[in-house]
């Protein structure tokens, strides 16, 4: 039997105090609803129906997924109403899984367990035990079997004491839903159509409702406020940090680590505090990442050391290289083995050959540097004329003196040296010394102006 998933994502999210639709607020730099979409895809959903309402245009612009079937809920009249408008899109011979776009941490395992637990002709229901169940629908049982769900607004004092609550996530057969959904009523305190009412309908028909619980209550927590969003962000990050620690990565403090993408690590990797990982990052064996670094879509080879407060984006760092502190490596840069880039150096769209050093206070952009090059402090590649970018080529074993300006396009050939303070505008031959600076002039008996 095929599986269709309905994601409820029509809520406005008033308590978020934001113009952004609630489900577009992010966990780990990814919209909550995208987390849900990715999870249901991972369990093999054959079709995904996304119920949208508030901010529908924004939602469709941000979630550009051609595999989704978008269904508009013009009026938000409850979860049952959302499923009623989705009903015409169901096939009779498929299972229907209903989830929420603002419950981002739901795991693949929990959903797989829920689907497997659904009895023939019955309902699989995800529930959770909470010490403080305020606000949730309570699970009513008869002789141990799930018999119904009563919402907080409609519950009696006795029912309010029940700790087992409904998460709102369930799976049922489409042919049964086609009978139950049209029979829903809005005669309740909220005047809404509750999907939970189908539980009682199924029970009255003698159908079995099988309840499954997640490994962690955090999985089924929804987001209505920014505080709840922040709490789930921390829960997500701590889970990822725990996975890394158990795999052998040394995190100095798992509470001060942010993974906002995918991280692959070799053995004996060390990561200090306040490191942020974005996109796809690969760290080789023995890599050390200092405090406060940001790594974005980069590859760092074995035994490289990235010192504190450095940013590396869209680049590759070779084995045994040392970067930072306070270095910035911008996209499309390739730093090969044993390269050293020191403090307050920016590298952009450049290649640095094996053993090349750029110690401090320099900008290298749109450049190719050979092996064993030394870049003196304060060196700038002047690559932009206000319209176009130009390339600088520096050969092997070149020594660039401090405070040089290299006016691109220019080539400095193997073994050449530039004198400190030079402005290099023409190509430099192999093994030549290039000096491009004004002759020093001394004015004797000079007196500085004095303040009056």
From Swiss-Prot:
Any Gene Ontology CC annotation = membrane
Pathway assignment reads: Nucleotide-sugar biosynthesis; UDP-N-acetyl-alpha-D-glucosamine biosynthesis; N-acetyl-alpha-D-glucosamine 1-phosphate from alpha-D-glucosamine 6-phosphate (route II): step 2/2; Nucleotide-sugar biosynthesis; UDP-N-acetyl-alpha-D-glucosamine biosynthesis; UDP-N-acetyl-alpha-D-glucosamine from N-acetyl-alpha-D-glucosamine 1-phosphate: step 1/1; Bacterial outer membrane biogenesis; LPS lipid A biosynthesis
Chain residues that bind acetyl-CoA: 377, 383-384, 402, 420, 437
Cofactors that this protein relies on: Mg(2+)
MF terms (GO), sorted A to Z: glucosamine-1-phosphate N-acetyltransferase activity; magnesium ion binding; UDP-N-acetylglucosamine diphosphorylase activity
Q: Where is this region: Pyrophosphorylase?
A: 1-226
Q: Where in the cell is it found?
A: Cytoplasm
Q: How is the cofactor bound?
A: Binds 1 Mg(2+) ion per subunit.
Q: What is its EC number?
A: 2.7.7.23, 2.3.1.157
Q: Region (N-acetyltransferase) spans which residues?
A: 248-452
Q: Which residues bind Mg(2+)?
A: 102, 224
Residue segments, region Linker: 227-247
Database matches in InterPro entries: Bifunctional_GlmU, GlmU-like, GlmU_C_LbH, Hexapep, MobA-like_NTP_Trfase, Nucleotide-diphossugar_trans, Trimer_LpxA-like_sf
Q: Where does UDP-N-acetyl-alpha-D-glucosamine bind?
A: 8-11, 22, 73, 78-79, 100-102, 137, 151, 166, 224, 330, 348, 363, 374
Where along the chain is the active site annotated? Answer: 360
- The chain's disulfide connectivity reads none
Tell me which UniProt keywords the record has, alphabetically. Answer: Acyltransferase, Cell shape, Cell wall biogenesis/degradation, Cytoplasm, Magnesium, Metal-binding, Multifunctional enzyme, Nucleotidyltransferase, Peptidoglycan synthesis, Repeat, Transferase
Q: Assembly and partners?
A: Homotrimer.
Function, as annotated: Catalyzes the last two sequential reactions in the de novo biosynthetic pathway for UDP-N-acetylglucosamine (UDP-GlcNAc). The C-terminal domain catalyzes the transfer of acetyl group from acetyl coenzyme A to glucosamine-1-phosphate (GlcN-1-P) to produce N-acetylglucosamine-1-phosphate (GlcNAc-1-P), which is converted into UDP-GlcNAc by the transfer of uridine 5-monophosphate (from uridine 5-triphosphate), a reaction catalyzed by the N-terminal domain.
Entry-linked PANTHER family: BIFUNCTIONAL PROTEIN GLMU, NUCLEOTIDYL TRANSFERASE
Concerning NCBIfam families, the annotation shows:
glmU, PRK09451.1
What name appears for this protein in its UniProt entry? Answer: Bifunctional protein GlmU
Source organism of this protein record: Psychromonas ingrahamii (strain DSM 17664 / CCUG 51855 / 37)
